[in-house]
Regions:
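Short, basic, glycine/proline-bearing loop/turn elements
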Residues: 67-68, 136-143, 171-174
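Catalytic core of membrane glycerolipid acyltransferases/transacylases, capturing the structured
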Residues: 87-146
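Residue-level "edge-of-site" marker
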Residues: 83, 147, 205
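Non-catalytic C-terminal accessory region of glycerolipid acyltransferases
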Residues: 2-38, 153-288
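Membrane-anchoring hydrophobic helices of lipid-metabolizing enzymes
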Residues: 2-93, 102-106, 131, 136, ...
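Short amphipathic alpha-helical segments and helix-helix/interface helices
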Residues: 67, 107-108, 131, 156, ...
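A conditional alpha-helix N-cap/helix-loop micro-motif detector
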Residues: 75, 145-149, 181-182
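Conserved beta-strand scaffold positions in the cores of enzyme catalytic domains, especially
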Residues: 79, 118, 139-141, 199-201, ...
Length: 288
C-alpha cells in the first residue's frame, strides 16, 4: 500500500510541457501591460537629495530585509560564490538567466551591501502607482523609443561611476523554471567594454526539492555566481563584447548541465509537438 501511495504521489507531480517558436523573442510572462513611452523625456538619473535619501531608506531598511527573509526563509534560496562580487573594489556588471518574476531579488542579495541597478523592460515603469517605487529599488528601464538611448547610456555610465552594480538579463524574456540557457545577443555586453568594468555571471539552477519543508517547494533553488570576467582590452569593441558574451554563456551552460536537473516545466520547440497535442498553460503559480 505504501509503495502504491508513493507511485501515486509521483504521478501527481506532472511536468508541464510548453512549446515555443522563437527562443530569442517568445515571452511567457503574460503581463499584457500597456507600455508607457520611455524616451528622451524620461528621467533616468535622480539627483534630488530628498528622493535619494528616501530611496536609501526604502532599499536598505525595507526592501533588503524583506527580500532576505523571503528568499532565504521561505524559498530557501542558496547562493554560491557571492564573495566574487563582494571582494571587487571596482563596480561590475551582473548577467543572469531569466526564469522567474522574482529574479530581481537575487542581485540585491548577491551584491549586498552594495546597491544594484537592474535594466528592465518599460513594462516595469508602466504600472500606475509604482513607477517611483520600482525606480527607487533600482529599476532602470531600457528605452522603447530611439530618442531615449543617449540618456539611457549616460545613466548606465553615471551609475557605474557611482560604483553601483548594474544587473542585466540578456535573455530578456521570462521562461519560468527553465533549466537550460537560451541563446542571447552580445548587444548588452557593450556596457562593460565601454566602461572597462568586470563582469560576473550568475545562474539560477533548479534541483529536486529536498531538506526542511521540501514538500512545500516545487524545486530547490541555488544561484551560482562566477568569478570576475574582464573585457579584453586588446580587441576591438565589437570583438571584446562578443568574447564577454561567449564567456558568460559558457559559465551559464556549465551550471545548467551540472546543477539544473529538476524540470518543473519542460520547454520544447514547436517542431517537436505531436499532432493534436496541446501546450500546457503557464499559471500565476509558475511565477515564483
Amino acid at each position: 500500500m505504501k509503495a502504491n501511495r508513493k507511485l501515486k504521489t509521483k504521478k501527481q507531480k506532472k511536468t508541464k510541457i510548453i512549446y515555443y517558436t522563437d527562443e530569442l523573442n517568445d515571452d511567457f510572462a503574460g503581463t499584457n501591460i500597456k507600455q508607457k513611452k520611455v524616451d528622451s523625456n524620461f528621467k533616468f538619473i535622480n539627483k534630488n537629495i530628498f528622493k535619494r535619501m528616501f530611496a536609501f531608506l526604502i532599499y536598505y531598511v525595507i526592501a533588503v530585509p524583506v527580500i532576505w527573509f523571503y528568499s532565504r526563509c521561505i524559498r530557501h534560496v542558496k547562493y554560491v560564490n557571492r564573495k566574487a562580487v563582494r571582494k571587487l573594489k571596482e563596480p561590475c556588471f551582473l548577467y543572469g538567466n531569466h526564469t522567474a518574476a522574482l529574479d530581481a531579488y537575487s542581485p540585491g542579495l548577491i551584491c549586498y551591501p552594495k546597491r544594484s541597478k537592474i535594466l528592465v523592460s518599460p513594462d516595469t515603469v508602466s504600472i500606475k502607482g509604482i513607477k517611483n517605487i520600482v525606480q527607487m529599488l533600482g529599476a532602470l528601464p531600457v528605452p522603447n523609443d530611439a530618442s531615449g538611448m543617449k540618456k539611457f547610456v549616460q545613466a548606465v555610465e553615471y551609475y557605474n561611476k557611482k560604483k553601483q552594480i548594474i544587473t542585466i538579463y540578456p535573455e530578456a524574456h521570462i521562461w519560468p523554471f527553465f533549466t537550460g540557457v537560451r541563446n542571447f545577443k552580445d548587444t548588452s555586453f557593450a556596457y562593460p567594454v565601454i566602461t572597462n568594468s568586470p563582469v560576473c555571471a550568475f545562474f539560477t539552477a533548479y534541483s529536486e526539492p529536498q531538506g526542511f519543508m521540501h514538500k512545500l517547494r516545487r524545486a530547490n533553488v541555488t544561484v551560482y555566481v562566477s568569478d570576475p570576467i574582464y573585457p579584453d582590452t586588446t580587441l576591438p569593441r565589437k570583438e571584446a563584447q562578443k568574447k564577454l558574451r561567449d564567456e558568460v554563456y559558457a559559465f551559464m551552460k556549465d551550471c545548467s548541465e551540472k546543477y539544473s536537473t529538476h524540470k518543473v516545466i519542460e520547454y520544447k520547440h514547436i517542431s517537436e509537438k505531436p499532432e493534436n497535442a496541446e501546450s500546457d498553460k503557464i499559471s500565476p503559480d509558475d511565477f515564483e
